[in-house]
Amino acid sequence: MRVIRMTNYEAGTLLTCSHEGCGCRVRIEVPCHCAGAGDAYRCTCGDELAPVK
């Protein structure tokens, strides 16, 4: 089964770094609608940011 990750998040979405031990968090206030907006948001460490569950 192929899983497609949704990287376009709505305003208010809280994201956290996927890197073990990082834990930084970012809240999306205004989603990006630019070319390449389907790419994952990333932490400065380089790992993807994922929605907080």
Swiss-Prot record:
Residues reported to bind Cu(+) 1: C17, C22, C34
Induction / repression: Up-regulated by copper, cadmium, cobalt, nickel and zinc, but not manganese. Copper and cadmium salts afford the strongest metal-dependent induction at about 1,000-fold. Also highly up-regulated under conditions that are believed to be attained in phagosomes of interferon-gamma-activated macrophages, including production of nitric oxide and reactive oxygen intermediates, mild acid (pH 5.5), and cell wall perturbation. Repressed by RicR.
Record carries keyword Metal-binding: yes
Binding site for Cu(+) 3: C24, C32, C43, C45
Propeptide residues according to the Swiss-Prot or TrEMBL record: 1-6
GO BP annotation list: response to cadmium ion; response to cobalt ion; response to copper ion; response to nickel cation; response to zinc ion
Keywords: Copper, Metal-binding, Metal-thiolate cluster
Keyword Membrane set for record: no
Domain of life: Bacteria
Binding positions for Cu(+) 2 per the UniProt entry: C17, H19, C45
Disruption phenotype: Cells lacking this gene show hypersensitivity to Cu(+) toxicity but not to divalent heavy metals such as Zn(2+). Deficiency of MymT does not impair M.tuberculosis virulence in mice.
GO MF, any single term: zinc ion binding
Annotated residues for binding of Cu(+) 4: C24, C32, H33
Additional remarks: NO and reactive nitrogen intermediates (RNI) can displace Cu(+) from MymT.
Role description: Metallothioneins are small proteins that have a high content of cysteine residues which allow them to bind heavy metal ions through clusters of thiolate bonds. MymT binds up to seven ions of Cu(+), with a preference for four to six Cu(+) ions, in a solvent-shielded core. MymT protects M.tuberculosis from copper toxicity.
Family, per entry: Belongs to the metallothionein superfamily.
Record's protein name: Metallothionein
Species name: Mycobacterium tuberculosis (strain ATCC 25618 / H37Rv)
Taxonomic path: Bacteria, Bacillati, Actinomycetota, Actinomycetes, Mycobacteriales
